Design a protein with these regions (language model features):
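Structural marker for long, regular alpha helices in very large eukaryotic proteins
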Residues: 1-9, 13-283
Length: 283
């Protein structure tokens, strides 16, 4: 699409004035996604060439946004959020692995943008995290394979700039793990608390998905991973938030309570270095 190409050139050369491009950015990318969308009931029939160009344009815009403009112009944040909302369909449901990777290439750009860590962080995270958790869940790839891939994530050089057309589920899982790792690794205490709360909401079945507490191994594994991958200085937030959820959530099922207690046991048994963990308060 010619208009998409022109927008990419503008974004590539734009050093400032992103606020003036926000409306055009939103309108062009949302229109391009509507053109690329499946015409029938089959969600795997996206025009992924157009979608890839949308994801590239999205990443260009959000990564080049000056932090000073982000703090003073809500319109930019709104435009970024609206386009991301439209892109969500590329990463959820019965789509192809290539479609998931295209979606993640856009999200990767967002996570390296100053807009991601503003006060809009809860909105952005609640949008992208359920899809990422779907991809690393046992419904996509068996837990033993995902757990093995997670052991190599910090050294994984996988790039989302060139999306392969024949990607297998394990490749997509690697990409999702890397995104989760990057987000956790750069989270401060406030953002980490929001991350834990959103993960619990996913496990509770509050994200238009069924509850995941029945899966003993995966629910424990994903919560323990939050501790393992978060910065040592703020990872104390994870067990404290879990205990708070355990004691303050009304009408919680016995299964949920059991899983949270099991998770605490796993965290403490592993003797992970947790700076600032007050065992008296925790108990």
């Amino acid at each position: 699409m010619i208009t998409l190409g022109i927008l990419q050139e503008l974004l590539a050369s734009c050093k400032a004035g992103h606020a003036y491009l926000a409306s055009a950015f939103q309108n062009v990318l949302i229109y391009a996604l509507s053109v690329a969308a499946p015409r029938g009931a089959d969600p795997s029939t996206w025009d992924l060439d157009i979608c890839q160009r949308v994801a590239v344009s999205y990443a260009l815009y959000v990564q080049s946004m000056p932090a000073s403009e982000v703090d003073t112009d809500e319109g930019m944040t709104h435009a970024v959020f609206q386009v991301l909302s439209e892109m969500q369909r590329l990463g959820q449901g019965k789509v192809t692995e290539q479609s998931r990777l295209v979606w993640m290439s856009g999200v990767a750009g967002l996570t390296h943008s100053p807009v991601f860590t503003t006060s809009a962080f809860p909105r952005f995270l609640s949008l992208v995290l359920p899809n990422l958790l779907d991809i690393v869940s046992p419904l996509h790839v068996p837990l033993d394979k995902t757990a093995a891939l997670s052991q190599e994530v910090d050294a994984d050089t996988l790039s989302l700039q060139n999306v392969p057309s024949n990607a297998v589920p394990e490749y997509t899982t690697r990409a999702a793990l890397k995104l989760i790792w990057n987000m956790l690794h750069s989270s401060d205490a406030t953002q980490l608390r929001i991350f834990v709360i959103n993960t619990l909401a996913y496990l509770d079945g509050e994200c238009q998905r069924p509850s995941s507490w029945e899966d003993n191994e995966w629910s424990l594994w994903i919560l323990a991973l939050l501790v393992q991958w978060s910065p040592p200085t703020s990872r104390y937030i994870v067990p404290h938030t879990l205990v708070q959820s355990l004691t303050m959530t009304k009408n919680a099922s016995n299964l949920r309570k059991t899983r949270l207690l099991q998770t605490m046991h796993v965290i403490l048994e592993r003797r992970t270095d947790i700076v600032g963990l007050n065992m008296t308060d925790l108990l």
